[in-house]
A protein has these predicted regions:
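Extracellular low-complexity, O-glycosylation-prone Ser/Thr/Pro/Gly-rich "stalks"
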Residues: 2-178
Length: 178
């Protein structure tokens, strides 16, 4: 019975350790002198951030094809329906669709090949808000895009030099108007 109990405890701790080392937190801060409504897929939906506010978004382990972008010029009613001048996602505050161009995108896939997170910035869909994406540990590369056609971002789909990696379990900071 002791062996069975020990094995159960071991596998429980292993499962918890595996989950926590792969999940990531994205702290999204608006430093712009205007309101930004960040949106996140496939988790997170959307939120309003005035200058200086931060939204902490916990992204589950194994998330692939994640996107975060800023929306501008938004107006929503009490039920979360409305529209945005840039980055609109079907007229709702809590996005379930990608944003309409132009959108500066932060893209990520967590715990992929060799236990790495992959991340990038993209202006393929256009540029709307200056953005910086920085891993908070691991000595990984910080990406900054202050204007259209910025050198740190994807400009065309097959630009394989723009994807970066960091060990799984890394947390990230995304800043609008860094």
């Amino acid at each position: 019975m002791t062996l069975l109990k020990s094995l159960c405890v071991f596998f429980f701790l292993l499962a918890i350790s595996f989950t926590f080392t792969q999940a990531a937190r994205f702290d999204i801060t608006n430093n712009c002198p205007y309101t930004v409504w960040p949106a996140a897929l496939p988790t997170g939906g959307g939120q309003q951030l005035t200058q200086g506010q931060t939204w902490s978004l916990d992204v589950p382990a194994g998330t692939t094809s994640g996107r975060i972008w800023g929306r501008t010029g938004c107006n929503f009613d009490g039920s979360g329906r409305g529209s945005c001048s840039t980055g609109d996602c079907g007229g709702v505050l809590q996005c379930k669709l990608s944003g309409a161009p132009p959108t500066t995108l932060a893209e990520f896939s967590l715990n992929q090949f060799n236990n790495l997170d992959f991340y990038d910035l993209s202006v393929i869909d256009g540029f709307n808000v200056p953005m910086q994406l920085s891993p908070t540990s691991g000595g990984c590369t910080t990406l900054t895009c202050l204007a259209d056609k910025c050198p740190d971002a994807y400009l065309f789909p097959d630009d394989n030099t723009k994807t970066h990696s960091c060990p799984s379990g890394t947390n990230y900071r995304l800043v609008f108007c860094p």
